[in-house]
Amino acid sequence: MTEARVSRGALAALLRALCALGCLLGRAAAAPSPIIKFPGDVAPKTDKELAVQYLNTFYGCPKESCNLFVLKDTLKKMQKFFGLPQTGELDQSTIETMRKPRCGNPDVANYNFFPRKPKWDKNQITYRIIGYTPDLDPQTVDDAFARAFQVWSDVTPLRFSRIHDGEADIMINFGRWEHGDGYPFDGKDGLLAHAFAPGPGVGGDSHFDDDELRTLGEGQVVRVKYGNADGEYCKFPFRFNGKEYTSCTDTGRSDGFLWCSTTYNFDKDGKYGFCPHEALFTMGGNADGQPCKFPFRFQGTSYDSCTTEGRTDGYRWCGTTEDYDRDKEYGFCPETAMSTVGGNSEGAPCVLPFTFLGNKHESCTSAGRSDGKLWCATTSNYDDDRKWGFCPDQGYSLFLVAAHEFGHAMGLEHSQDPGALMAPIYTYTKNFRLSHDDIQGIQELYGASPDIDTGTGPTPTLGPVTPELCKQDIVFDGISQIRGEIFFFKDRFIWRTVTPRDKPTGPLLVATFWPELPEKIDAVYEDPQEEKAVFFAGNEYWVYSASTLERGYPKPLTSLGLPPGVQKVDAAFNWSKNKKTYIFAGDKFWRYNEVKKKMDPGFPKLIADAWNAIPDNLDAVVDLQGGGHSYFFKGAYYLKLENQSLKSVKFGSIKSDWLGC
């Protein structure tokens, strides 16, 4: 142990010396941090390794005989399932799909999970929660599961009741890697959960990977204790003494306890509580929530912090008296607002600041990594201790993942409809609604809810329907070229293509790329100078860098310079002719200067006075890069204008010319 520590210290000293030498040799250009191998990190699979494992797990391609011929054929099945071009090749879109987080159940029939289209032969179904995740307090977990069951009871005769002892129809638990059912999880990301079809034994049981960060989909959920806002949730970011905080802090306290504000402005409202910490309380165990007692003795060894010793599941625990060996009283340590995920620290919190390769880091960093993931050290000096973990991200909505898994527990298989809850890939949806495809599937098994009054008329269509490009005339909400691809927006769906000559692929959920957007947008354009996508919906707009929403958005249209009377934008585009952005609403348009970040004077103007033959109340406008033309869309048709002369050179059908129908 001493030799290893000396070796690491010597290595750290050498790295610091090299860093100092680099600074002396040339301060003009700071060298990027070298990519290193983090202890406990899982090495990423090659594309071929990923494909073989993916097709074996989800499409039944045997590992030992999944040769190139079989692989190609199975790849086409997978590509067809996800609406991808059926190339049979490991192209970029196929690999991207395989790397997305998803349910662990297969996409084709697997008789271990779904023997003979099973269903429950009763409408009263019981469930029991065996274990909890430390990421959320028990009340939030209970509520998420109850709401997930209600998704299905709202549209069927099924009724779900919770029991606290004995064998329930659906047993719910959290676990890591191999957890007792022969279908192991795979660490952070990848497989999120799985469930078995209705039946005896494990039938209906639902398991959730506890290496994932469980949230409600929008970052860590932190319910405070004590203070003057007991039981409320932290508000991140919050403002204290004129500074913004994005996590719990001990700033302003001398006792070291972490706290947060439950409103944005603590300076104004003064509402706060203490963040979960083992010094305040524990979860589960047998100590009824009593806090940890440090130091405590376990098997003759003294511990002054939470530990995973004595456990095979990796959960952090502590004794709640000074001698566990004598009293046998313990509890699990709650996750703090800066608890890490993955790494080699078993969920220990970040320690900020920390030293890495001789440099001090005041916040999470991607230094040293090739994948860009944010991480932190869990001691003050990574170079000496090499203890680390990934920083909390948005996490995975326990409600959405559970609602999907409980669909399997009712007998539903995966859906090819990307708008369905039962689609295999996880996509966070802020305003969730069960799709028509989901409702149709569950009602084929159990019938409609007796609470749904259909009256004497025809049965109504329940839930949103995923549109099909060539089977109906779609009036698009927006069309834009973003990062070189043409995107077509309709309600919560998008289609994408590189050129108008190719049939767009999709649909995909808008939330796949831009999760914070509302279900329906009014307009979209890309600022090519900054490569930012700007979306309009109602009287607000959103600005994204790639898939990251810029801080402070959405903002009102008035902050862009539009008058208060404009409550909706019809279309917008950045014109390559003069690099200005044009915003259309009704019969008027405005011109926005992207460099000066303000509207040009002399606007609005009437569309009819400035644009040749262009109608009012447009649906979308796009200027394709390097094409020399702009395209104005309304209804099922479009008008093509030559940029220099503003002459109309073509009037055509969107369906035939842009959608390949």
Curated annotation (Swiss-Prot):
Chain residue ranges for the region called Collagen-binding: 223-397
Cofactor(s), by name: Ca(2+); Zn(2+)
Alphabetic keyword roster: Angiogenesis, Calcium, Collagen degradation, Disulfide bond, Extracellular matrix, Glycoprotein, Hydrolase, Membrane, Metal-binding, Metalloprotease, Nucleus, Phosphoprotein, Protease, Repeat, Secreted, Signal, Zinc, Zymogen
Record localization: Secreted, Extracellular space, Extracellular matrix; Membrane; Nucleus
Enzyme class: hydrolase
Stored Pfam families: fn2 (PF00040), Hemopexin (PF00045), Peptidase_M10 (PF00413), PG_binding_1 (PF01471)
Signal peptide: 1-30
Catalysis performed (reactions): Cleavage of gelatin type I and collagen types IV, V, VII, X. Cleaves the collagen-like sequence Pro-Gln-Gly-|-Ile-Ala-Gly-Gln
Region feature Required for inhibitor TIMP2 binding, mapped onto this chain: 415-661
UniProt binding sites for Ca(2+) 4: 477, 522, 570, 619
Binding site for Zn(2+) 1: 103, 404, 408, 414
GO biological process: angiogenesis; cellular response to UV-A; collagen catabolic process; extracellular matrix organization; proteolysis; response to hypoxia; tissue remodeling
GO molecular function, one term: zinc ion binding
Domain Fibronectin type-II positions: 229-277, 287-335, 345-393
Binding-site residues for Zn(2+) 2, renumbered to this chain: 179, 181, 194, 207
Active site positions, chain numbering: 405
Main location: secreted
Stored InterPro entries: FN_type2_dom (IPR000562), FN_type2_sf (IPR036943), Hemopexin-like_dom (IPR000585), Hemopexin-like_dom_sf (IPR036375), Hemopexin-like_repeat (IPR018487), Hemopexin_CS (IPR018486), Kringle-like (IPR013806), M10A_MMP (IPR033739)
Binding residues for Ca(2+) 3: 186-187, 209, 212
Collagenase-like 2 as annotated region, ranges: 398-466
Residue positions assigned to the propeptide: 31-110
Post-translational modification: Phosphorylation on multiple sites modulates enzymatic activity. Phosphorylated by PKC in vitro.
Any one GO cellular component localisation term in the record: membrane
Motif position, Cysteine switch: 101-108
CDD domains (alphabetical): FN2, HX, ZnMc_MMP
Annotated protein name in UniProt: 72 kDa type IV collagenase
Gene name as annotated: MMP2
